[in-house]
Design a protein with these regions (language model features):
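Membrane-embedded alpha-helical transmembrane segments of multi-pass integral membrane proteins
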Residues: 13-16, 20, 83, 87-94, ...
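Physicochemical signature of membrane-embedded alpha-helices that form the seven-helix bundle of GPCRs
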Residues: 9, 47-50, 80-83, 106, ...
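Interfacial loop-to-transmembrane junctions
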Residues: 90, 94-119
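Short alpha-helical packing/oligomerization segments
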Residues: 65-86
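Core segments of transmembrane alpha-helices
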Residues: 52-64, 118-119
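N-terminal signal-anchor transmembrane alpha helix
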Residues: 1-31
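Cytosolic, membrane-interface loops and tails of multi-pass inner-membrane proteins
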Residues: 22-47
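Juxtamembrane boundary at the C-terminal end of a transmembrane helix
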Residues: 122-136
Length: 136
């Protein structure tokens, strides 16, 4: 397979997205809400979990693929991909805890993990663009 890290990450996150989508549908059926959140806080929360995953995943997968195509170190990419996924899983866990009136700590850790992973990937790509493409 040409892009094994990107492919594995995409597959795992696709399954996670299906799970989150199921949670949204289940809540829609429960509250008989076809569109929006219908003034239901739990619906807001499950929709937020789903949409947040979709907001961060595409650009991360693109960056992983670009780095894999540039023959970047697969082990380092795998570590970053796992960190990103942990961040996304922690975000959902944190959203559920926050909705239950508990601390936002897990959401904060999730966002720092997600953003840090994305910044590292972006800087790595910029570094390769400058050093490999512009200076050679």
């Amino acid at each position: 397979m040409t892009l094994p890290v990107t492919a594995m990450t995409a597959a795992i996150l696709a399954l996670f997205f299906i799970y989150l989508s199921y949670q949204v549908v289940k809540q829609r059926v429960r509250t008989e809400t076809s569109f929006g959140a219908g003034n239901d806080e739990h619906m807001d929360m499950v929709r937020g979990c789903q949409s947040n995953l979709i907001e961060y995943t595409p650009v991360t997968l693109i960056m992983l693929a670009l780095l894999e195509l540039s023959s970047a170190n697969h082990m380092a990419l795998m570590v970053l991909a796992v960190a990103f996924m942990i961040g996304r899983f922690l975000h959902v866990f944190g959203m559920h805890r926050h909705h239950a009136g508990k601390t936002v700590k897990f959401r904060q850790i999730a966002m720092v993990t997600t953003w840090t992973t994305m910044v590292i990937l972006a800087l790595w790509i910029i570094y390769l663009c400058v050093t490999v493409n512009l200076l050679s």
